Amino acid sequence: MAVAVEGARRKERILCLFDVDGTLTPARQKIDPEVSAFLQKLRSRVQIGVVGGSDYSKIAEQLGEGDEVIEKFDYVFAENGTVQYKHGRLLSKQTIQNHLGEELLQDLINFCLSYMALLRLPKKRGTFIEFRNGMLNVSPIGRSCTLEERIEFSELDKKEKIREKFVEALKTEFAGKGLRFSRGGMISFDVFPEGWDKRYCLDSLDEDSFDIIHFFGNETSPGGNDFEIYADPRTVGHSVVSPQDTVQRCRELFFPETAHEA
């Protein structure tokens, strides 16, 4: 009987895992101080983590100053979890070049450059392919565009499906090569080995024996870079539309007594 009572009293081990762009911050912008403060309040009740497609330096820049991010979050998974931090310590890092090999990698890069060379857009800037540890990030307009140019491209992309058509061309060209593609943010898409989507981080969480992993993301429809982890049976998925929506969902789940105040 004592064992049963002890089991009933055991505090559930819960992890709230958040996407970054569109979920905790506006795309590629800094986190709002009120959202940041709420997350620390949430951390008093559950463990918290982030999983983003961007490299560690970009995630750190958006969610704090310097390396604050690995102190403010229990888990930080950069580049879909191929770069992993737990309780402030680097756990592991994988590299796409070792996995794919140089020949396939160059074929992929050359195809993307050739395809983009034929695109006529209102504007093109720089950094069309960003090489990361766990993926290639491909941007037809170029990642160095301004916020205004980013919005302009995003609106055009909604009408003309620029990224969607690009991805379809890649799927045809590299069929059977073990590659996956997903949209992320407003101006780009990611290319990565099969299995290296955001679910990659869940494998390393298995050993921590969480009772529930809540995942919050905004790109949760098929083709979005949150879809696979959102739909994975190991998570309870929550589709959000903004950082404020994320905060409200968490209030309803973990602070129901104050949810009406939002």
Swiss-Prot record:
Modified residues (N-acetylalanine): 2
GO cellular component labels: cytoplasm; cytosol; neuronal cell body
This protein's record includes keyword Phosphoprotein: yes
Positions contributing to Mg(2+) 2 binding: 230, 232, 235
EC number in record: 5.4.2.8
Activity regulation details: IMP, a metabolite whose concentration is elevated in anoxia, inhibits phosphomannomutase and phosphoglucomutase activities and strongly enhances glucose-1,6-bisphosphatase activity.
GO biological process: cellular response to leukemia inhibitory factor; GDP-mannose biosynthetic process; mannose metabolic process
Tissues with expression: Present in brain, where it is restricted to neuronal cell bodies. Present at lower levels in pancreas, liver, lung, gonads, uterus, adrenal glands and pituitary (at protein level). Undetectable in intestine.
Cofactor: Mg(2+)
Record's subunit section: Homodimer.
UniProt cross-references to PANTHER family, sorted A to Z: PHOSPHOMANNOMUTASE, PHOSPHOMANNOMUTASE 1
Entry protein name: Phosphomannomutase 1
Native organism: Mus musculus
Organism lineage string: Eukaryota, Metazoa, Chordata, Craniata, Vertebrata
